[in-house]
Regions:
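Conserved glycine(s) in the ABC-transporter nucleotide-binding domain "signature"
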Residues: 1-93
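Anion-binding and metal-coordination hotspots
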Residues: 3, 11-14, 28, 77-570
Length: 570
């Protein structure tokens, strides 16, 4: 969006101009909106000046700047074609507006116009009143899955080219969100499933996200049914992964295809998936399930004296062991890595599970002694009591007697428990086809999985860009709402990348949100309506830097006056 000044009837005004693609005409069309007078603020009596509100500048302006660098509105409009209300906002304008709302002031879409009115920076030159929830939901029913996937690939290509993101290692993971449903319209996305929030009264929508190695920037996502499998969603993304692979090469200006690696956890293990990833051009790095035969072999190797060795550099506090073995029909490098944080978490989990199991085992012991439990029922309930947290490996049970009069004894074997902690707990088995990578590089790449987990924390309830609470009842609305949320996450991540700050995303957005214009109404002594003037705040060093980087002064030129050095007193 371009901001300039124009004289009208002897008065100068600041004008915002925007170019939007019109699919019907097959060309771009121009829009303009008046931002306000360009004249300097009037001289006024402070005793008669009153504040009448504030307007957002920093957070909205920063995300609008990032969206303009990627040409998000144009990218979406070109992919989706002539989608949008007649004379109203296009699909690109609606989605970008909702994405910025989710990141700056999460709320219902019926409050979208109010949110846009509360900001000095503008997403569109159209009046805020045309950005309604009804317009969003109508557009959502016209956009297809394929169009959203094409838009994701185009946006990822633009992000890599503009912000020079590292994409040699990409991390993939899934989560789910619960949503309210009150409609008789059949849908495929919101299903009964195991919600991460532990709520059973709501339906679940799944989300799989592919994240860049640097910046926590989501490059590709997929919405899927809440009762779907993790492997299924990754397999459904294979075509998108292939297109993304080619688009990233173009964005980085490579003459030869890059060697990219896809990182994921053990829930995505599948021999067939390993082969399919190789076909679409990706190397693989995965944390094998510990019950896998190759993982068992690697753990036995790592349990030998002197097998676990400390790594160098930033990973000098990490110990790992390495071997090469056949995993199914393919040759892979296995790395057993030790994590004290994981070990402590598993020990806490075992302590809680063991306490519950002891209560159940004592109850079974009493029922058996009273002759109120058959052997088959006893065996089944003992198996259920010891099913979690490796309890069956160190809680020794003995069931004897007859089918109708069984006997039951149990004990906790401290030696077996110590052996479990020494050889299995706190350890992951990493499996990769990157045979030439060093052990440190493999461990560092797998730690990139944290990028996805951090992104999910930002999208959960109470997070920076929350997905819910959601009342998007139809599948189309759920898809486009999720797209806007992921886009909001990407805008925040890119804004943090541009500033290069060490602070986390939440303090960064809070600092940007502190750049607000205070509206004051004053009396000049002349005739006519009392003028309303925007006053700039006192800025910190970080906020002054953000004003320059994100060009916030184009929306609020008076911000520059806050950045001038104070005169020295003689």
């Amino acid at each position: 969006m371009h901001v300039f000044e124009r004289e009208v009837n002897g008065h100068r005004y600041r004008i915002a101009a925007q170019s939007v693609w019109d699919a019907t005409r097959g060309r771009s069309v121009a829009r303009q909106a008046v931002l306000g007078p360009a004249a300097p603020p009037p001289v006024a009596d402070l005793g008669t000046t009153r504040t009448v509100g504030t307007r957002a500048v920093g957070d909205v302006g920063a995300l609008v700047w990032v969206a303009e660098q990627l040409d998000l509105v144009g990218q979406l409009d070109r992919v989706c074609g002539n989608v949008g209300a007649q004379g109203g906002p296009s699909v690109g304008e609606l989605v970008v507006a909702v994405a910025i709302q989710r990141a700056c002031a999460p709320g219902a879409k019926r409050k979208l116009a109010e949110f846009l009115n509360s900001s000095v920076a503008r997403v569109s030159c159209l009046p805020s009143a045309v950005f309604t929830g009804q317009a969003f939901h109508r557009v959502a029913q016209q956009v297809t899955d394929r169009q959203l996937e094409q838009a994701q690939v185009a946006i990822a290509k633009a992000a890599v080219a503009r912000f020079e993101l590292a994409t040699d290692v990409l991390a993939f993971d899934t989560t789910n969100f619960d949503t309210h449903i009150a409609t008789v319209t059949p849908g495929k996305l919101a299903r009964r499933g195991h919600a991460k929030s532990k709520r059973r009264d709501l339906r679940v929508v799944g989300l799989g996200v592919l994240v860049s190695e640097t910046g926590h920037v989501p490059l590709l996502y997929r919405t899927y049914a809440g009762n779907g499998s993790d492997q299924g969603v990754l397999q459904a993304c294979l075509e998108g992964l292939r297109e993304l692979h080619e688009a990233l090469d173009d964005g980085e200006g490579r003459s030869t295809p890059a060697q990219r690696t896809l990182v994921r956890d053990g829930g995505f293990w599948s021999p067939q998936l390993e082969l399919e990833l190789d076909v679409v051009g990706y190397h693989s790095l995965i944390s094998l399930p510990l019950g896998h035969s190759a993982a068992e072999q690697a753990l036995q190797m790592a349990a030998r004296r002197g097998a676990m060795k400390a790594l160098s550099g930033k990973l000098r506090h990490v110990r790992a062991a390495r071997m090469r073995a056949a995993v199914g029909t393919v040759d892979r490098t296995l790395v057993v890595v030790e994590s004290q944080e994981l070990l402590q978490g598993q020990k806490r989990g075992i302590a809680v599970a063991l306490r519950k199991a002891k209560t159940e085992l004592r109850k079974l012991e009493r029922l058996t002694q009273a002759g109120r439990l058959a052997r088959g029922s006893l065996e089944r309930r003992v198996q259920q009591a010891l099913a979690r947290e490796h309890l069956a490996s160190f809680v020794v049970t003995t069931i004897g007697g007859t089918a109708k009069a069984p006997t039951f004894r149990w004990r906790v074997d401290a030696g077996r428990r110590r052996h479990l902690e020494r050889t299995r707990l706190g350890r992951r088995v990493l499996c990769t086809d990157r045979q030439l990578w060093s052990t440190g590089r493999i461990v560092h790449a797998f730690r990139g999985q944290w990028n996805v987990e951090e992104l999910f924390r930002r999208a959960k309830k109470g997070g920076l860009v929350p997905w819910g609470p959601s009342y998007q009842w139809a599948d189309g609305s759920l898809r486009l709402h999720t797209f806007a949320t992921v886009l909001g996450l990407a805008l925040v991540s890119l804004a943090k990348t541009v500033l290069g700050t060490e602070a986390s995303a939440r303090p960064l957005m809070q600092s940007l949100a502190g750049i607000r214009a205070t509206l004051v109404r004053t009396t000049t002594g002349g005739t006519g309506r009392r003028p309303t003037v925007m006053l700039a705040p006192e800025l910190t060093a970080e906020q002054r830097r953000a004003v320059k980087v994100f060009e916030l002064d184009r929306w609020f030129p008076t911000l520059l006056s806050c950045m001038t050095a104070r005169p020295l007193q003689s």
